[in-house]
């Protein structure tokens, strides 16, 4: 499965997109349950190398990330949603499967942000976002796909995927729907973002009352704007991973190399 075509919606306009694979395949394109554009490949012939190349031109609309006034009120935590809202939001409200003791400690950690921000929803979420950026060390190779949100909390280090998983967990424990976003980030000379510029990037989208989904990037301590290009979203990394697949026959040692380049096209 390939999730390499950027999202197309009211905030992100895909002007052109091309996805090529260097070996013969049978392919089928479809939209998954999260609205991601997916290409399913079937490869029958052996190969020693496969190159997957995705090129897209995307217009990301510039909007004020803090232009939502209704949130400047105190809230009761965890947030309570109407039954018809929960039908849609439930997949993004379930905390990860962790021991009760670990979830309890993470819930206490999440509530500490609520208390020091006097139950203001937006200030609480901004505080969590910036605290992860400020107090957690970005260290490649320090974690793997099995690293839990609690492990990241205890060890205070990781990469964008780990910081995203931690913020998703904390938000859900506060009753805030949270989803995993995989995409790209522009880190050119005019951009203030400095981490994760040469590979795919991960961040969080939180569903805010009377506002909708808003992007938070705890790796860089910012809200997402025109420097972030969304490619796929889901409940977690597995739902949004750029590539995945299964070898049914044969197989052997394998390596994966990823190269990402994001350029700013002048109008």
Features from the language model and the residues they span:
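Hydrophobic/aromatic-rich core segments of domains that either
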Residues: 130, 162-250
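Secondary-structure boundary elements
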Residues: 73-158, 166-168, 235-237, 248-266
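Short beta-strand segments enriched in hydrophobic/aromatic residues
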Residues: 58, 208, 262-264
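Generic structural "secondary-structure junction" signal
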Residues: 4-6, 21-23, 36, 43-45, ...
């Amino acid at each position: 499965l390939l999730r390499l075509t950027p999202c197309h919606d009211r905030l992100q306009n895909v002007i052109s997109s091309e996805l090529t694979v260097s070996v013969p395949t049978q392919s089928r394109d479809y939209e998954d349950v999260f609205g991601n554009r997916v290409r399913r490949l079937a490869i029958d012939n052996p190969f020693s190398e496969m190159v997957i190349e995705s090129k897209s031109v995307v217009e990301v609309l510039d909007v004020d990330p803090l232009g939502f006034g209704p949130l400047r009120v105190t809230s009761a935590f965890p947030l309570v949603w109407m039954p018809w809202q929960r039908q849609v939001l439930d997949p993004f409200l379930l905390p990860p499967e962790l021991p009760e003791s670990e979830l309890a400690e993470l819930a206490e950690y999440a509530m500490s942000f609520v208390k020091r921000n006097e139950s203001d929803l937006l200030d609480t979420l901004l505080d969590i976002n910036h605290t992860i950026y400020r107090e957690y060390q970005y260290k490649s190779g320090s974690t793997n796909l099995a690293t839990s949100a609690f492990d990241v909390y205890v060890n205070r280090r990781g990469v964008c995927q780990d910081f995203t998983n931690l913020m998703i967990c904390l938000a859900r424990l506060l009753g805030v729907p949270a989803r995993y976003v995989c995409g790209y980030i522009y880190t050119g000379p005019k951009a203030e973002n400095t981490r994760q510029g040469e590979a795919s990037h991960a961040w969080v989208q939180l569903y805010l009352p009377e506002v909708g989904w808003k992007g938070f990037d705890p790796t860089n301590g910012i809200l997402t704007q025109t420097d972030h290009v969304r490619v796929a979203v889901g409940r977690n990394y597995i739902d949004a991973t750029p590539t995945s697949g299964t070898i049914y026959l044969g197989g052997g040692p394998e390596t994966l190399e990823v190269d990402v380049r994001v350029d700013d096209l002048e109008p």
